[in-house]
Amino acid sequence: MAERADLVFHNKVIDGTAMKRLISRLIDHFGMAYTSHILDQVKTLGFQQATATSISLGIDDLLTIPSKGWLVQDAEQQSLILEKYHHYGNVHAVEKLRQSIEIWYATSEYLRQEMNPNFRMTDPSNPVHIMSFSGARGNASQVHQLVGMRGLMSDPQGQMIDLPIQSNLREGLSLTEYIISCYGARKGVVDTAVRTSDAGYLTRRLVEVVQHIVVRRTDCGTIRGIFVSPQNGMAKRIFIQTLIGRVLADDIYMGPRCIAARNQYIGIGLVNRFITFRAQPISIRTPFTCRSTSWICRLCYGRSPTHGDLVELGEAVGIIAGQSIGEPGTQLTLRTFHTGGVFTGGTAEHVRAPSNGKIKFNEDLVHPTRTRHGHPAFLCYIDLYVTIENQDIIHNVNIPPKSFLLVQNDQYVESEQVIAEIRAGASTLNFKERVRKHIYSDSEGEMHWSTDVYHASEYTYGNVHLLPKTSHLWILSGSPYRSSIVPFSLHKDQDQMNVHSLSVERGSISDLSVTNDRVRHKLFSSDLSGKKRGGILDYSGPDRIISNGHGHWNFIYPAILHENSDLLAKRRRNRFIIPFQYDQEREKELMPRSGISIEIPINGIFRRKSILAYFDDPRYRKSSSGITKYGTIEVDSIVKKEDLIEYRGAKEFRPKYQMKVDRFFFIPEEVHILTGSSSIMVRNNSIIGVDTRIALNTRSRVGGLVRVEKKKKRIELKIFSGDIHFPGETDKISRHSGILIPPGTGKKNPKESKKWKNWIYVQQITPTKKKYFVSVRSVVTYEIADGINLATLFPQDLLQERDNVQLRVVNYILYGNGKPIRGISHTSIQLVRTCLVLNWDQDRNGSIEEAHASFVEVRANALIRDFIRIHLVKSPISYTVKRNDTASSGLIPDNASDRPNINPFDFKARVQSLTQHQGTIRTLLNRNKECQSLIILSSSNCSRLGPFNGSKYHNVTKESIQTKDKEDPSISIRNSLGPLGIVPKIANFYYLMTHNQILLNKYLLLDNLKQTFQVLQYYQVIKYSLMDENGQIYNPDPYSNTILNPFDLNWRFLHHDYCEETSTIISLGQFICENGCISKYGPHIESGQVLIVHVDSLVIRSAKPHLATPGATVHGHYGEILYEGDTLVTFIYEKSRSGDITQGLPKVEQVLEVRSIDSISINLEKRVEGWNERITRIIGIPWGFLIGAELTIAQSRISLVNKIQKVYRSQGVQIHNRHIEIIVRQITSKVLVSEDGMSNVFSPGELIGLLRAERTGRALEEAICYRAILLGITRTSLNTQSFISEASFQETARVLAKAALRGRIDWLKGLKENVVLGGMIPVGTGFKGLVHRSRQHNNSPLEIKKKNLFEGEMRDILFHHRELFGSCIPNHFHDTSEQSFTFTGFHDS
């Protein structure tokens, strides 16, 4: 040993890594024995010092990082901004989730990096610091949880919980944080229990696969290699690790000079020389390149990990490899127990500005993009230098390539502001998985979208659409009401309605009494009980309210006065309004007796002589069965076509028998319907008295003649009351059979000259005994007064023209002549229905063909009435209606319920609204025509942008209208902004009238009607427009039904701003985002769609935007109604999972078992198939299969090795590549004989080794078709040469039975077979003597010649075809295909 004086004294802290280096150098220099002696001394020293120091940990040693407060605050601020963006529709839910996770993760990481410097500066001798950072006990993440911030936890599935734990364990957790933290802790406990066994099983399977691989030769003579080059973006450390301990496969030249020879062992010196010389790709030998089938040679394996020399012959390298991979798993599962499920994932690092100042960079080097969080940013491709100029200092910040720059040029930044985001490099491992995320609608309404949407090809007929580009989906608010209870709804587009009269909530139809008759809505819920007044109430002015004392009918016909009343009267005349009521007391009946049912066609259009309403008069109601007859002369029953009502689904009435008659007769009879099996106690045609027993439990109510008729399954038993006459033979009464005889007519027989006072019905009855008799029955007579013309009830219009609406009262019989009427038990039959028929005189040119109806609600004091309003229209001009699917031109059919009708009541006919429950109906497009959907827009769904006073407006025709700001007290109302529901805030549709106050002269002048109706309708002269769902715009003027394009109408608002005039263009149907600037009065408060554009204001229907990115799937159709909680969009995105080893081990296992769960392995399999097809096609059969399989296998081998290494490296576990290579070689060494060509040797579907397939093909000179296949480790263990090894692994009985049937032979080459049978194990480094030296070295020249011949042929073929598949095979394709690795190398492919 050298003298003590000569020794160098190192004053330096030695931590774990330094210790490793020291030991390895000691071994290199002094050998094993000496090193162990020195290490003993080091150990003793360590224990001695530890005892003397006796480090203890107190709670005061845990120092919290001072910068934590503002970091957390900063993160919370960012989350808040993010929430706002999401609300505005700038960021969708996935981006939001992703970003909030990254915000918190970055904060947590930043704190973790601050930890060490903080301790070093404030308290370097802190025991926590000493222990954790020396590597003695505890790691950074545990200390980080104690003094930094606990951060994001992952639940037992490895999914992230997106609520971060902001406290650390020193400060203590809040209740929520504690519960979330328990999630993570539970994960730790579960992992310790379950995953340990998993790791053990993994080790067992791995060893099973490779137990027979032993080093048997020195050199297999392969000329293949795998290229490794540091240029491929591989980290230098990994490059060195890959090379050290390998053997070169080829000479390496630097220019003309050879710097390393083939089969030379690579040590650290050689690696350094390569790096200095920047040698081009270095070809090395790996277990992949070894040519021996079931073992491996020394040169391909390389250095033995135990002692730094080439591996010895007879070493069981397979078992060593299996254990090296499996063992870290067992160790690592235990480690997660301490950190307890804290989420670790790779995220982008942030670059923060060093000081305040103005930022500058070269804009040519960046280009704009959208980050994965939905932020606008700049992407830089090369290193970017950013300068931040303060007054006196200039800071330079270097931003690495592929980073996002989050600031603009010349922007002022504050100190510590995030200016850039560095993309996470390849070194940090992110487990990604594809996740579908459904976004559910949080409000109800209809769906619109702002771009074209493609149908997904597999769902051509469904409602799943794919988005081609980023766009917004809008949910336009409104309460949907699906009218599936009744076949159609009385309400039409743009009708006013009380939301409570037709209950909006799904499921509860509390105030909607529905029968199978579709017209019986209790829509008209006016309570007139306090308002019954007799006589005609006359008021000053032409307006009249007429009441006839019963409270059933109230007609209002308001006339209109205006200075140009002539024009207006023409436009607004010809409508009248009927209020309806029902009696509250009798609400339990389905239909109030005196109530009127209204009958409106589905499309709201009346033809002439249509029936408008009907009511059932109680006088014409019978409770017994019978027959109706119409008068003596039956020719009277004239059926008029237009008087019929077409009922759909009405079971009660048979409308085809409806006729207008003057009087009719009802012949009562008693009817019993008995089942066919019941025994009848009376005979047919017998006469019985009252209360006779007919059947077992049936008694007759009246006496008379019994008729029994047998129908298919039942017996009908009728009892006629009345007299029976047996006429003589000479009587000619036979002609009276089945007729009605008026009173006063006597019989022809003089003997019985009897006169009847009432009408009678004579019916001849012929019993079986040929003697007939006549039954004379009593008849109930009904007289029906002829129709009254109700047109007289309406005041004549001032400018009377002949096309006024008239109403006639007409009575209809509901049953046909002579038809039997069956009374169902305890219900009464309505014989006559009173109808109101709508009529109007034909105009001279006959143009008025139809009348339109709509509902209006008028509120008088506290009373609400529903009115129906009828409107005459000239027949429509032909339009061209453009729909998204068909463009049809021509008249719009009357019953076009599949497209919104063009109704003249498009303007909102609300008179005064209740605060909440008032709404306007919008009809929706629906695919099925039977069930029409409505949406009710109530006041809470619309808001109005107030009048822009004092501004000038130009519309497209350059007319400028100046609003007059009169000092009028009523104008001030209009300036308030508010929801649409409160009357003054509607875009001046209606205004509340106080006593005789005159508005601006552009509004109509109306007398106030002595407080009866405080509110009437005003029609303004100024036009406003409405938009329906298809984007068509209507003028609500019944005579000018012109349809404009939505783009024809843009209003520009010119703001008088301080410096410049900006002009906003607003078009109908445009969507406005929240806080978008429209007027100079400040931003718009709510997002929504412009519904009505007015000269000085807008009405906006509130809507909620949802952002959707390309590739997202939209559910539902355009314009479809969505309810709360319906699926709106589905995003597919990649999501990080937590990256601890417990997620890692299953990943390793999945890779080794080749389960195609993630996109990577699926891609691998697809790539495999693609290669196989292409190469076979290009080169032809035998070589094609060979090369195809080899290239495929080579590709997949490398990517498998990289994937497994990635998992372990991320955990800081170093496993040498060659261990993984040995296992991967076994997984990929088999090929599957395919069915393409039959060969004599192998049957299709058989698994054979690749080398065996090649050799057999060469020997037989016959093409064997096969393709590469990836087997999992379990399948590989069950597909070995030895059935004993397979049987001892799994499925013993099956394996042994098959082997016996096939007569398999086990050559006992592996370790396991010999262990099972108790023989000698054919491994061990002392085994050399048994290997025949002669076979190793004295290769016969013939063999060598054959080998070279094949290689030469191979090379020629490859060079000849290089141009053809240059795309598939790289340029430095070396001797054979294995070297196609050049382009992958050992970096992540």
UniProtKB/Swiss-Prot annotation:
Zn(2+) binds at residues 220, 290, 297, 300. Signal peptide: none annotated. Its EC number is 2.7.7.6. It is found in: Plastid, Chloroplast. Its cofactor is Zn(2+). GO terms for cellular component: chloroplast; DNA-directed RNA polymerase complex; mitochondrion. One of its GO terms (biological process) is DNA-templated transcription. It catalyses: RNA(n) + a ribonucleoside 5'-triphosphate = RNA(n+1) + diphosphate. One of its GO terms (molecular function) is DNA binding. It holds the Pfam family RNA_pol_Rpb1_4. Keywords: Chloroplast, DNA-directed RNA polymerase, Metal-binding, Nucleotidyltransferase, Plastid, Transcription, Transferase, Zinc. NCBIfam families: rpoC2_cyan (TIGR02388). DNA-dependent RNA polymerase catalyzes the transcription of DNA into RNA using the four ribonucleoside triphosphates as substrates. Belongs to the RNA polymerase beta' chain family. RpoC2 subfamily. In plastids the minimal PEP RNA polymerase catalytic core is composed of four subunits: alpha, beta, beta', and beta''. When a (nuclear-encoded) sigma factor is associated with the core the holoenzyme is formed, which can initiate transcription. HAMAP family: RNApol_bact_RpoC2. This is DNA-directed RNA polymerase subunit beta''. It comes from Chloranthus spicatus (Chulantree). The lineage of its organism: Eukaryota, Viridiplantae, Streptophyta, Embryophyta, Tracheophyta.
